[in-house]
C-alpha cells in the first residue's frame, strides 16, 4: 500500500495455531506512517523480517531503513524485536536497540520515519474495531467533504490543513461571503471523539452554512454565539458542547469583528510585530443557558495574516513526555513566506517535529487567512 509517496508492502504469513481459538488474544504489529496506521500484521510462529529489500515480510521503502533492518519473533509468548545491524538503528523510548528486546503491548519501536507498534487484540475486538473504523472513515469523509476549498486569488485568501486524529474529533471550519462587503470565518471544536462528536460538528456547520438561526444578524458575532447557544444546549445533545471562534471582516472599513466561546484566541500577524490575540470572554456553546456573548473588533492592516486553529494543533506531547502548548506553538507561525499556499501544512510539519512519534491525540486544524 502507498502513502505519501512511500510504500509499505506486507507479505501475509500463516498465524500460529493459537489463532485457531477465535477469542484468544493475538499479537499484531501495527505499521504507523506520519501518524496513520498503514498496515496491521499478525505475529505468529514465523519470524518476520523488516527492511527495504523486496524479499522481506514487511517491506518499507525509506532510505533510512536498511535492506535487512529488523526481525520480529514470538518467543515464550512475548514479541521480541532485534535490530540486524542496520545502518541507522532501531529505537525504543529514544534508545537504540543493541540486543534482542521484548516489545510490550502498546509500545513501539522506530525505524526511519516508521513506527512498529505491538497490539494485543482478540478476534472479536478486531471485528468490532473494523466496524468502528468503517464508521469513522465514513464520518471523516463526510466532514472533509463539507470543508471549503482554499481561496487562492483576491484580496482575502485562505489556506488550511486538517488532519483528523485516529479517534476522529469534532473539528470543523468554514469561511465565505455574507454579502458584498462582509466575509465570515469560523472554527468549531466539539468536545469528545468519535462519530458522535464528528456528526455534532456537522450539525453546527450546517446551521451556520444555511444561516438557520432565526432573527440573528450573522454580521454580529455576539448574536451568532447567543443563537447557537440557544439551539445547542448540551443536555439536549448528548452532553456535547463546543468551542468556537467566529469573525466577520468588512472590506470597506478593514475592520474585523469577532467573538469566542470557550476558544483560545485567533492570532493576527501584522507588520512583523508580535501577534494580536483576538479573544473575548464567554463559555463554550451549550454549557450555560441564556448566556450573553459580547464581541470585539480590530483593524486589519494590509499584509496581515490571521491564524485560526484547534487545540489539537498545540496541545501535543514532546518526545520527552512534556506537554507542549501555545508558548511552543506561536513561534512556528508567521515568517517571510507565511501567506503563501501550503502555509497551514508547513505548520503541521513543524508541530510533528516537536511532537513524539505516533498519531496526534486530537484533530489538527489550522486555517490561515491572508489580507491584502
Regions found by a protein language model. Give the residues of each.
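Intrinsically disordered, low-complexity acidic Ser/Thr-rich regulatory segments
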Residues: 1-61, 73
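Forkhead-associated
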Residues: 39-112
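… and, occasionally, acidic/histidine-rich disordered N-termini of signaling adaptors
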Residues: 127-305, 358-372
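Signal-transmission/dimerization alpha-helices at domain junctions
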Residues: 112-122, 206-215, 315-316
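C-terminal catalytic subdomain
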Residues: 17, 225, 296-308, 313-372
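PAS-family sensory domains
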Residues: 114-117, 186-188, 309
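Sensory coupling linkers of modular signal transduction proteins
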Residues: 119-129, 192, 314
Amino acid at each position: 500500500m502507498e502513502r505519501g509517496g512511500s510504500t509499505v508492502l506486507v507479505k501475509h504469513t500463516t498465524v500460529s495455531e493459537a489463532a485457531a481459538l477465535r477469542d484468544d488474544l493475538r499479537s499484531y504489529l501495527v505499521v504507523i506512517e506520519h501518524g496513520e496506521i498503514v498496515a496491521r500484521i499478525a505475529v505468529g510462529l514465523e519470524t518476520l523480517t523488516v527492511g527495504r529489500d523486496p524479499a522481506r515480510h514487511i517491506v518499507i521503502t525509506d532510505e533510512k531503513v536498511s535492506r535487512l533492518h529488523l526481525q520480529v519473533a514470538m518467543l515464550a509468548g512475548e514479541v521480541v524485536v532485534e535490530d540486524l545491524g542496520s545502518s541507522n538503528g532501531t529505537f525504543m523510548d529514544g534508545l537504540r536497540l543493541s540486543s534482542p528486546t521484548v516489545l510490550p503491548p502498546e509500545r513501539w519501536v522506530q525505524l526511519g520515519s516508521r513506527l512498529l507498534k505491538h497490539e494485543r487484540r482478540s478476534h472479536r475486538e478486531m471485528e468490532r474495531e473494523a466496524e468502528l473504523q468503517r464508521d469513522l472513515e465514513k464520518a471523516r469523509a463526510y466532514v472533509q467533504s463539507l470543508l471549503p476549498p482554499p481561496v487562492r486569488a483576491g484580496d482575502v485568501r485562505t489556506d488550511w490543513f486538517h488532519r483528523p486524529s485516529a479517534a476522529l474529533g469534532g473539528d470543523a471550519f468554514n469561511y465565505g461571503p455574507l454579502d458584498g462587503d462582509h466575509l465570515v470565518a469560523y472554527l468549531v471544536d466539539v468536545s469528545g471523539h468519535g462519530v458522535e462528536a464528528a456528526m455534532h460538528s456537522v450539525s453546527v456547520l450546517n446551521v451556520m452554512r444555511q444561516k438557520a438561526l432565526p432573527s440573528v444578524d450573522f454580521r454580529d458575532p455576539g448574536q451568532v454565539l447567543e443563537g447557537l447557544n440557544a439551539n445547542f444546549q448540551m443536555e439536549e445533545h448528548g452532553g456535547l458542547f463546543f468551542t468556537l471562534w467566529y469573525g466577520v471582516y468588512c472590506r470597506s472599513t478593514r475592520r474585523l469583528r469577532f467573538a469566542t466561546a470557550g476558544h483560545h484566541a485567533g492570532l493576527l500577524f501584522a507588520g512583523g510585530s508580535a501577534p494580536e490575540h483576538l479573544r473575548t470572554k464567554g463559555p463554550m456553546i451549550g454549557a450555560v443557558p441564556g448566556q450573553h456573548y459580547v464581541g470585539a473588533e480590530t483593524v486589519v492592516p494590509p499584509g496581515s495574516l490571521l491564524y485560526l486553529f484547534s487545540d489539537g494543533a498545540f496541545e501535543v506531547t514532546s518526545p520527552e513526555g512534556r506537554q507542549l502548548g501555545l508558548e511552543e506553538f506561536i513561534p512556528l507561525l508567521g515568517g517571510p513566506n507565511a501567506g503563501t499556499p501550503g502555509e497551514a501544512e508547513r505548520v503541521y510539519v513543524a508541530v510533528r517535529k516537536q511532537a513524539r512519534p505516533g498519531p496526534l491525540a486530537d484533530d489538527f486544524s489550522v486555517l490561515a487567512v491572508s489580507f491584502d
